[in-house]
Regions:
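Short, charged, low-complexity loops and linkers
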Residues: 200, 241, 313-317
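Short, well-structured alpha-helical interface segments that form or flank functional binding sites
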Residues: 144, 209, 316
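Short hydrophobic alpha-helical module
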Residues: 221, 286-289, 293, 320, ...
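Long, charge-rich alpha-helical interaction segments
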Residues: 212-299
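Transmembrane alpha-helical segments and their cytosolic interface motifs
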Residues: 298-330
Length: 425
């Protein structure tokens, strides 16, 4: 019987296409810490889970290596979906909430398959939080990833070491298409060595030890605010205000500044809890008013708002004809995207929907554009038209975001009350 990690010609043909469109889904896409991935070892990657299917596509597209993923079992209920997921090299794993029978009947086999994947030197990616959540935090890690690691170590740990690789994905925005994505790989955990050093302990104790280590190391790879932090929203708002946005800085540097700011805020809260509580309440009020007015945090942190409004107004006026042209020419993509997004209650699916509609519709419209252009124009004009249309949707998305921020800047510039509130924070 064919293994999930075996070569598949159709998958191999489609993979570069998917990778290309995934990269187009982000204005910037960066990977750091690849030197932390051990060579000649069995590697299991534990990834934070914040952005639905994008969390799998982002590490998939970082290079052309084979990768297998594990997802929660409830999405495999329909046979057609199960076949598609298998084609995409995604294995199911079942949780107690899926029913004890599902766990008992399926997980032993799945764990064996997962161990076989890493035995064949194929990278295995899991989301140990078990479900996605758009927060800069971590839920308690489920045991599945550790059961796989221990099973693999039991089967072939004497041949090659088994490692858990903490992996963090930091998005510039969970909800806006073509934001930024940073993948970070942290210090690996040598499971084989850990088990050998704790031979006298039972499996439950070993799993708890590994869980603590993986949680700690994953938290160092994201803008981490403790999950039990009741003032999460205020802390994150203050972090964005204090860290400030620098357009072209490396994403790793931006993450480092966020982490430093969060640490300072939490330490200040511990030193002066009463003052912090009062400040957090004022921050929450400010945030609600800011969002109600449609003002972006980028406007709030802009130290030269007047100058920014001036040059953005000029750019908006000059670029308006091109923007209107892309609004019309890419209408099928953004209209379908908008309709589909409205059918999902969970806004976290927004970027996945945007990626899917662009990946399917843009190539079809591109083919139509090429046919019409070369049938009706000179080859020079047709070539230029095709090139322009190829970048038209990216231009449309980025220009729409530019206009949103420009409008936000104008609102912020003329809202004296809110600006006074921000100065008091």
């Amino acid at each position: 019987m064919a293994k999930i990690q075996d070569d598949n010609k159709l998958y191999t043909c489609l993979r570069p296409f998917i990778d290309h469109h995934l990269r187009k889904s982000f204005r910037r896409y960066e990977v750091i810490g690849q030197e932390n991935i051990p060579q000649n070892a069995a590697c299991i990657f534990g990834v934070n889970h914040t952005n639905t299917l994008m969390d799998a596509l982002v590490p998939l597209s970082m290079n052309s290596e084979k990768k297998v993923f594990i997802a929660r079992g409830d999405i495999f209920k329909k046979p057609l979906i199960a076949k598609f997921m298998h084609f995409c090299r995604i294995l199911p794993i079942y949780r107690i909430r899926d029913g004890f029978k599902s766990v008992r009947d399926n997980n032993t086999e799945i764990i064996d398959k997962a161990a076989d994947v890493i035995h064949d030197n194929v990278k295995l990616f899991l989301f140990p939080e078990a479900s996605h959540r758009t927060k800069h935090s971590l839920k308690q890690l489920s045991k599945g990833i550790f059961h796989i690691a221990l099973k693999a170590n039991e089967q072939f740990g004497h041949e090659k070491p088994v490692y858990l690789i903490p992996t963090g994905i930091e998005y510039g925005d969970y909800f806006r298409y073509r934001s930024t994505a940073l993948i970070s790989f942290g210090e690996p955990i040598n499971v084989t060595e850990y088990v050998n050093n704790h031979k006298d302990e039972n499996e439950a104790v070993i799993i708890n030890g590994l869980r603590e280590m993986l949680t700690e190391r994953m938290s160092k790879l994201i803008s981490f605010i403790p999950d039990n932090e009741e003032d999460y929203n205020a802390i994150w708002e203050m972090t964005k205000m204090k860290s400030k946005f620098r357009l072209y800085e490396p994403l790793a540097q931006r993450l480092e500044r966020n982490q430093k700011t969060i640490k300072e805020i939490l330490e200040w809260k511990e030193r002066e809890p009463e003052k912090a509580k009062e400040t957090f309440e004022r921050v929450d009020k400010f945030t609600k008013k800011r969002k109600k007015k449609g003002i972006s945090i980028f406007s709030v942190t802009n130290e030269n708002i007047g100058g920014t409004v001036f040059w953005k107004t000029l750019v908006a006026l000059i670029g308006l004809p091109a923007y209107i042209a892309t609004v019309i020419s890419t209408l099928p993509i953004w209209l379908v995207t908008m309709i589909l997004k409205k059918s999902f209650k969970d806004k976290a699916w927004g970027n996945t929907i945007s990626f899917a509609t662009e990946t399917i519709l843009h190539p079809l419209l591109m083919i139509l554009c090429i046919v019409l252009a070369f049938c009706n124009l000179s080859w020079e004009q047709a070539t230029l038209t095709s090139i322009i249309y190829y970048i038209s949707y990216e231009f449309f998305v980025d220009a729409t975001e530019f206009l949103r921020r420009w409008i936000s800047d104008v609102k912020w510039c003329f809202n004296k009350k809110l600006r006074a509130m921000s100065r008091e924070l």
